[in-house]
Regions:
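Conserved C-terminal helix/tail region of periplasmic/extracytoplasmic solute-binding proteins
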Residues: 9-11, 17, 84-85, 91-94, ...
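Hydrophobic aliphatic residue packing
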Residues: 6, 13-15, 103, 121, ...
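Short, solvent-exposed loop/beta-turn-alpha elements that line the ligand-binding surface or hinge
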Residues: 30-35, 55-85, 114-147
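Bilobed periplasmic-binding protein-like "clamshell/Venus-flytrap" ligand-binding domains
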Residues: 39-43, 86-124
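Bilobed "Venus flytrap"/periplasmic-binding protein-like clamshell domains
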Residues: 1-8
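Periplasmic binding protein-like
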Residues: 8-60, 95-96, 112
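Solvent-exposed, acidic/flexible segments
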Residues: 3, 24, 47, 68-77, ...
Length: 147
């Protein structure tokens, strides 16, 4: 359904997009080759820092070829590399916000579509349960006690 909604939204602004399905091996080969015009994929951050997204997707020409549709703005790539070295938290976050605005809003090189909701049922006897920050629902439970 997501594919059809994206296709309809693109058609509404005059872009004709087709939908093709591939087996995983072919899909990965196409991504690595740089011959795929666009794709929808899922991804979850490994650690809670904007560098995790920016560097993974836009840290080099090779990363953008494999993960981000051959985005070729070398100035952005240089800024991504430099941002990880900024030690002032406010300046670092401001740079990552500016990079996100450039990549997502100005260039539309990456379009986040949705986020997952994870629900947890906790009994009255459970103490100190803290879900993993990224929302994974398939994680190990440590340091949880019962009353």
């Amino acid at each position: 359904l997501v594919y059809q909604v994206v296709q309809q939204n693109l058609q509404a602004i005059g872009i004709n997009a087709g939908i093709k399905s591939y087996d995983e091996s072919s899909w990965l080969d196409l991504r690595k080759s740089g011959e795929m015009d666009s794709f929808i994929a899922t991804w979850t951050m490994d650690y809670n820092d904007p560098a995790n997204i920016m560097y993974t997707f836009f840290g080099s020409a090779a990363k953008t070829r494999i993960r981000s549709l051959n985005y070729s703005d070398t100035e952005v790539m240089a800024r991504v590399a430099a941002a990880s070295g900024i030690t002032d938290d406010a300046k670092r976050m401001a740079e990552y916000q500016a990079l996100e605005r450039k990549i997502v809003v100005d260039d539309a090189a990456w379009v986040p579509l949705l986020g997952s909701t994870h629900l947890f049922a906790i009994g009255d006897r459970v103490e100190s349960f803290i879900p993993y920050w990224a929302g994974f629902s398939n994680f190990y439970v440590n340091d949880v006690t019962l009353k």
